[in-house]
A protein has these predicted regions:
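A structured, charge-rich N-terminal accessory region that forms the first stable segment of a protein
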Residues: 2-83
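Short amphipathic alpha-helical segments
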Residues: 53, 57, 101-109, 158, ...
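A short, surface-exposed helix-loop junction/capping segment
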Residues: 80-98
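Acidic, metal/cofactor-coordinating or nucleic-acid-engaging core segments within structured domains
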Residues: 101, 164-259
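Extended, Lys/Arg-enriched charged tracts that mediate electrostatic binding to polyanionic substrates
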Residues: 101-131
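Loop-centered beta-sheet repeat module
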Residues: 120-183
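Short acidic, S/G/P-rich loop/turn micro-motifs used as interaction or catalytic elements
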Residues: 156-159, 228-233, 285
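Extended, charged low-complexity segments
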Residues: 234-301
């Protein structure tokens, strides 16, 4: 990517969800035995005493809704007109109309991809349905081809079941992915992105649009929010040791789940793409989803 294009990217195509999203989570260091292109990113929610801090993540997710429900072009116009409050209400209404049970997980994955991998959203499932993935993000790498990150997010009663389902989705969906030049027509770009962003995307992603178009590499990102209660025995431990003991329990659970699904995981070797896996445990992921939706309905009122 030429120097002038790198400057355009840094100035005109930033991720909308910034690093404060990550303040709701703690990354857990773990050495899990997967292939070199299968990257496990294991996080837990921040704590409030010896409980997960659902209030903090709930508040931050509300801030993320406009970036999930509205196009970049709409958001830019709102900022220019200083009408972000009105835009947030509109975004909440749009979000509540989405019937997919995975929409909160999709938004969490968008937060990780934008704040952790610095990969802005290109399109969502509601804008383009490409092979059954929930959306795509674009990651601009210095001196490398652009990466297109196809994302899918799920909730599950157990991590083991979630991993099995995610593998099934990848193996069915990846062969069906369509090329970007057939998906990103002029109408889509002009409707959803500013003029500067349209030029950047077309010149980098669509072959033949510019002399320095390199095409892109496919990459995958999976989010699984799953149930893993904080064990009662842990809450009677010393407060200073509690976080590390909790993480040991979570990591052990992940190791056991991945070992249990080892044969299925091995099937992914045929997929020629890096896969980023984001795993986050909840006490009750369905309860968290339901309570967050109810809080949004109150915001709307």
């Amino acid at each position: 990517v030429p120097l002038e294009m790198e400057e355009d990217l840094s100035n005109n195509f930033k991720a909308l969800i910034q690093s404060d999203f990550m303040e709701c989570f703690v990354r857990m260091e773990c050495d899990l035995n997967l292939d070199k292109n299968r990257i496990v990113n294991l996080y837990r929610l921040c704590l409030d005493g010896k409980k997960y801090n659902y209030v903090k993540i709930g508040e931050r997710l509300i801030d993320c809704i406009p970036s999930f429900s509205l196009s970049r072009k709409q958001l830019m116009r709102c900022r220019e007109r200083n009408a972000f409050g009105k835009a947030t209400l509109s975004a909440i209404r749009n979000f509540l109309k989405i019937e997919r049970k995975t929409k909160i997980s999709e938004m969490l994955l968008q937060g990780f991809l934008e704040s952790y991998l610095h990969a802005p959203k290109l399109y969502s499932f509601d804008e383009i349905n490409n092979a059954g993935f929930h959306g795509a993000h674009v990651k601009f790498n210095k001196n490398r081809n652009v990466e297109l990150i196809h994302s899918a997010a799920f909730i599950s009663n157990s991590l083991s079941d979630g991993v099995s389902y995610a593998i099934d989705v990848i193996l069915k969906a990846f062969p069906e992915l369509r090329s970007l030049d057939g998906l990103l027509g002029n109408t889509f770009l002009e409707t959803n992105f500013t003029e500067d962003e349209c030029q950047i995307l077309a010149s980098l992603l669509i072959p033949g649009e510019s002399s320095y178009s390199q095409g892109y590499e496919d990459r995958l990102a999976i989010f699984i929010g799953y149930n893993h209660k904080i064990e009662e025995s842990l809450i009677y431990e010393n407060a200073s040791r509690f976080p590390s003991l909790l993480e040991q329990k979570i990591i052990l659970n992940v190791q056991q789940a991945l070992e249990y699904r080892k044969e299925e995981i091995n099937k992914l070797s045929i997929v020629n793409a890096t896969i980023d896996c984001f795993f986050v445990p909840f006490d009750d992921v369905n309860k968290f989803n339901d309570e967050f939706i109810e809080s949004l309905k109150n915001e709307e009122d």
